[in-house]
């Protein structure tokens, strides 16, 4: 495990200097989920949520969040993203339904896009919660995690279990 690089000689936080890092294609995939009641599932899949098309709004929110990551996370570098994609799928559980959210972010640059993918997935989930909370505040968000990342000096990472 490498040492932390976000501290200066005085032990204070700093933004890491990435000037000399090589530009490479970098991709990160993150996942999260929102577990909802049957009522919310039925209304979402029939586009009957009063606030509108939940998945369409969540998708746009996720893309916007990826682009704003550096504004939210203090030592995150502002990046020129080349692509952001959000995918949704449903998993049925015993007495609930799980919306699985997958965010994929891509760039060509000198630092990775893991935080952008995690932020995109998280804001998607928060948007789903916001749009459905009038029906049930008991929705569960998470877990949220990095599935895979490619590019850069540290190379390829793939989560062992997904």
UniProtKB/Swiss-Prot annotation:
Catalytic activities: (8S)-3',8-cyclo-7,8-dihydroguanosine 5'-triphosphate = cyclic pyranopterin phosphate + diphosphate
UniProt-annotated catalytic positions: 130
Listed InterPro entries: MoaC, MoaC_bact/euk, MoaC_sf, MoCo_biosynth_MoaA/MoaC, Mopterin_CF_biosynth-C_dom
CDD domains xref list: MoaC_PE
Swiss-Prot/TrEMBL keywords: Lyase, Molybdenum cofactor biosynthesis
UniProt binding sites for substrate: 75-77, 115-116
Translocase recorded as keyword: no
One Pfam family in the UniProt entry: MoaC
SUPFAM superfamilies with a match to the protein in the record: Molybdenum cofactor biosynthesis protein C, MoaC
Superkingdom field: Bacteria
Assigned EC number: 4.6.1.17
Keyword Iron-sulfur: no
One function term, GO molecular function aspect: cyclic pyranopterin monophosphate synthase activity
Single Gene Ontology BP annotation: Mo-molybdopterin cofactor biosynthetic process
Pathway the protein acts in: Cofactor biosynthesis; molybdopterin biosynthesis
Record text on subunit structure and interactions: Homohexamer; trimer of dimers.
Functional note: Catalyzes the conversion of (8S)-3',8-cyclo-7,8-dihydroguanosine 5'-triphosphate to cyclic pyranopterin monophosphate (cPMP).
Family statement drawn from the similarity comment of this UniProt entry: Belongs to the MoaC family.
PANTHER family for the chain: CYCLIC PYRANOPTERIN MONOPHOSPHATE SYNTHASE (PTHR22960:SF29), MOLYBDOPTERIN COFACTOR SYNTHESIS PROTEIN A (PTHR22960)
Protein name stated in the entry: Cyclic pyranopterin monophosphate synthase
Organism: Geobacillus thermodenitrificans (strain NG80-2)
């Amino acid at each position: 495990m490498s040492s932390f690089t976000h501290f200066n000689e005085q032990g204070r936080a700093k933004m890491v200097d990435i000037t000399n890092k090589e530009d490479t294609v970098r991709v990160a995939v993150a996942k999260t989920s929102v577990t909802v009641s049957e009522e919310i599932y039925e209304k979402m899949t029939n586009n009957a949520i009063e606030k509108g098309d939940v998945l369409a709004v969540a998708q746009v929110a996720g893309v916007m969040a990826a682009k704003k990551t550096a504004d939210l996370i203090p030592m995150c570098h502002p990046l020129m993203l080349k692509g952001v994609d959000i995918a949704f799928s449903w998993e049925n559980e015993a007495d609930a339904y799980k919306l699985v959210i997958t965010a994929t972010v891509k760039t060509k640059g000198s630092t990775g896009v893991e935080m952008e993918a995690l932020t995109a997935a998280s804001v998607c989930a928060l948007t789903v919660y916001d749009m459905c909370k009038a029906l049930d505040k008991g929705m569960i968000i998470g877990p949220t995690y990095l599935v895979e990342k490619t590019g850069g000096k540290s190379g390829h990472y793939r989560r062992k279990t997904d």
